[in-house]
Each structure stands twice: as C-alpha cells, then as structure tokens.
C-alpha cells in the first residue's frame, strides 16, 4: 500500500511538470513557436474552435508564423481572433494565408517573459507540495488506522520527501532552461 502511494505521488508530480512544460510552450523565446497561438479560438460557424483545428500553422523563420486556413472564408475570422487575442502583432492577410511578423524582443520584454516563466515554475512547485501533503496525509492515516507502525510512517514520509525533492529539482531545471532560452539574444 505504501508503494501505491509512492507511485501515485510520482505520477501526479510528473503530470505537474508536464503541465509546466506545456505552459512554457506558450511563452515566446528567441524563436517564435507555433504554440504561442494555442490559446486562440476562432469562431467556426458559431463554435469557438482552436486555431490549429481550422488551418495549418507553421513557422517560416525565427520571427514569422504563417496560418493557412482549410477554408478561405475563415481568413477574416482568424484575423479577428488574432487581433482579439492581443499577442502583440497585427495579422497580415494576403487573401490566401495570414502571416504574423513578430518584432524582435527587447531586453525589457525578455526580462518580463522570464519573470512569467519563474512565476509558472513557482505555481508548479506549489502543486507538487500539495501533492506531497496529500501523500503524507495518506501515510499518517495508515499509521492512525494501525495499518503501519510509527517507524514505517516516518520512513514513508521521508521517501515522499525524496520524491518531492526530485520533482522540485526537475522544475528548477525546466525554469532555468526556459529562462536561458528567453534571455538568449
């Protein structure tokens, strides 16, 4: 039963790290990523639909993205959705595709985005600590119900702490890597 708690704890913490990395993909670094458009929804016949579901999004170079809609009549809707998303660029509609030209980031912008990355990392650490607390509560309940001894409980809590320390270390590494990518000119 303790092994089950350890496995659940590792799994949940790993999911928190994966969620952090997905969140990082929406941040702009030196090269513009197509993921920066992931949160944009287009009005597709009255239904809010993810941009990547109504057309292909590709990176032309480090500062340019191109959107090729499956249906040409969606160009205006895509253009409006991008403007409403307020991502800092104006869409350039050529009648066939929409191009987004991102200006090079200033040092100030880089620092702000790096600060956002750090805040995301802190949120992930809080999630990991909450998972640790839940695991420790399960261990204490087993001890209280006399299913494990006090010594086993202490060892189990130490093991949960080791798992937590590993997860926090991975989060710190992810944050450092993302900050380096953002601040790199």
UniProtKB/Swiss-Prot annotation:
Cytoplasm among keywords: yes
Localization terms from the record: Cytoplasm
GO CC entries: cytosol
Pfam families: RRF
Matches recorded under SUPFAM superfamilies: Ribosome recycling factor, RRF
Segments for region (Disordered): 138-159
Predominant cellular place of this UniProt entry's protein: cytoplasm
Lineage top rank: taxon: Bacteria
Family: Belongs to the RRF family.
Function: Responsible for the release of ribosomes from messenger RNA at the termination of protein biosynthesis. May increase the efficiency of translation by recycling ribosomes from one round of translation to another.
Protein name per UniProt: Ribosome-recycling factor
Name of the gene this protein is made from: frr
């Amino acid at each position: 039963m303790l092994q089950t708690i350890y496995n659940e704890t590792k799994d949940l913490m790993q999911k928190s790290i994966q969620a952090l990395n997905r969140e990082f993909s929406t941040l702009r670094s030196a090269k513009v990523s197509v993921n920066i458009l992931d949160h944009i929804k287009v009005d597709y016949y009255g239904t809010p639909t993810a941009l990547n579901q109504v057309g292909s999004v590709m990176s032309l170079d480090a500062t340019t993205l191109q959107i090729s809609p499956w249906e040409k009549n969606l160009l205006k809707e895509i253009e409006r959705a991008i403007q409403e998303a307020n991502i800092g660029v104006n869409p350039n509609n050529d009648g066939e595709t929409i191009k987004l030209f991102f200006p090079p980031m200033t040092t100030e912008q880089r620092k702000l985005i790096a600060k956002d990355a750090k805040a995301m990392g802190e949120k992930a650490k809080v999630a990991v600590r909450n998972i640790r607390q839940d695991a420790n509560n399960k261990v204490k309940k087993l001890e209280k119900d006399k299913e494990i001894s006090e010594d086993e409980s202490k060892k189990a809590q130490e093991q949960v702490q080791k798992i937590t320390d590993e997860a926090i270390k991975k989060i710190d590494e992810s944050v450092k890597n993302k900050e380096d990518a953002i601040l790199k000119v």
